[in-house]
Amino acid sequence: MTSPSLLRGFGAYAPERILTNADIESMVETTDEWITTRTGIRQRHVVAPGQTTSDLAVEAARAALADAALDTADITHVLVATCTPDASCPNTACIVARKLGMTGVMALDCNAACSGFLYGLELAQGIVAARPASRVLLVAAEALSLRCNWKDRTTCVLFGDGAGATVVTADVDATQGTAVLEDSIVTSDGSLGDLLTIGGGTANPYAIGDSVGEEYFVRMQGRDVFKHAVRSMTQVCNDLLARNGFTTEDVDLVIPHQANLRIIEAVGDRLGFASEKVFVNVHDFGNTSAASIPLALADARAQGRIRPGMRVLLTTFGGGFTWGAALLRF
């Protein structure tokens, strides 16, 4: 990357309603011990009745704008990463822009499942590189609780709802809440897509009067996804570090996609990072898909885990399959 983009300001939002493992015990045949042992998740935030993905996105966007000391009038593009849009049309970015009172902006959705934030970051960087005066409001938001099969204990225990946001810009004089995007890699392998799906598109359309089948909800081959996720995130991180001449010693903190604790620990171990260098908040939020990394970034900053001068390695893996990694310098 010859002219690095800046991430200016970070914001996050999680719905007020919390669903604990004890709550889920009354819904499906499972226990708190079973969930915690296998996933590390103790609770997850879920939307209230009538609350949508765009509602979560708006709250995170407002927080990011405030952190960046920017106003909606400063934004030229709105990019929303989600696999749980409010509707097929209009796109969620247009809805977010409307709710924020914004007109005259380019508004676009990006769907790369759990990799959505890093894919969105790649797109935003391209926009800023082509049009240096641009300021891209990048929001990743999911309401996966609305697409979970609450009778399937293998998936419903994993997911939560939330949103995270940042502003991508080339403002070299910006200092407040700023990180430099040093480099990133995103990639995919569509041949493995059937291992993790959310149905309901034109390949499986519904007619009026049809009952909703299991294929409408999240379906996942957990063991296969685990294997590919760990291998892919490890490899892409090694590739990114190598092409920048870095080793693990040059990284101060790793923020992996918060899929589950076993995946997070396996990736950290294979990369050779001490556990204290790997940020984890999956126990409080569950897997929030595209929102996972920006939510974790905001959380890590709030906890004082990220300080000026630190280099942070992000890595993710999602349906598609899609995966990637990015290096930020704060």
From Swiss-Prot:
It holds the Pfam family ACP_syn_III_C. It catalyses: malonyl-[ACP] + acetyl-CoA + H(+) = 3-oxobutanoyl-[ACP] + CO2 + CoA. Transmembrane segments: none annotated. Keywords: Acyltransferase, Cytoplasm, Fatty acid biosynthesis, Fatty acid metabolism, Lipid biosynthesis, Lipid metabolism, Multifunctional enzyme, Transferase. InterPro entries: ACP_syn_III_C (IPR013747), ACP_syn_III_N (IPR013751), FabH (IPR004655), Thiolase-like (IPR016039). One of its GO terms (biological process) is secondary metabolite biosynthetic process. One of its GO terms (molecular function) is 3-oxoacyl-[acyl-carrier-protein] synthase activity. Residues 258-262 are annotated as: ACP-binding. The active site is at C114, H257, N287. One of its GO terms (cellular component) is cytoplasm. Its EC number is 2.3.1.180. The last Arg residue of the ACP-binding site is essential for the weak association between ACP/AcpP and FabH. Catalyzes the condensation reaction of fatty acid synthesis by the addition to an acyl acceptor of two carbons from malonyl-ACP. Catalyzes the first condensation reaction which initiates fatty acid synthesis and may therefore play a role in governing the total rate of fatty acid production. Possesses both acetoacetyl-ACP synthase and acetyl transacylase activities. Its substrate specificity determines the biosynthesis of branched-chain and/or straight-chain of fatty acids. NCBIfam families: fabH (TIGR00747), PRK09352.1 (NF006829). This is Beta-ketoacyl-[acyl-carrier-protein] synthase III. It comes from Nitratidesulfovibrio vulgaris (strain ATCC 29579 / DSM 644 / CCUG 34227 / NCIMB 8303 / VKM B-1760 / Hildenborough) (Desulfovibrio vulgaris). The gene is fabH.
